[in-house]
Amino acid sequence: MHVISKSALPPFWAKHPASKGPLEAWYKLVKAGLYKDFSDLRRTFASADYVAPYTVFDVAGNNCRIIAVIHYNRQRLYIREVLTHPDYDRWSKLYRSGKI
């Protein structure tokens, strides 16, 4: 799968150095994968959630979240946000209230 906006990862791990290894491992797995749909993706990323239209990945032992949009037919994953768990909680609250 082609990952768009990988450039969002280094600034995050610069602020949160412990996340660098897990984020790099996540990137390698996604890049190497060919996923036909969300169910197929969950075989590799069991903790991924679909929050329409986003796919949310738990990374680094639930310490950070990657919010992405995936076009399975084009094999493209667009990183929209890389957040800490508390920042994701705030994002989720805004999402549920329709502000995102």
Language model region names:
Residues M1-N63, H71-R76, H85-I100:
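Basic, Lys/Arg-enriched alpha-helical interface segments
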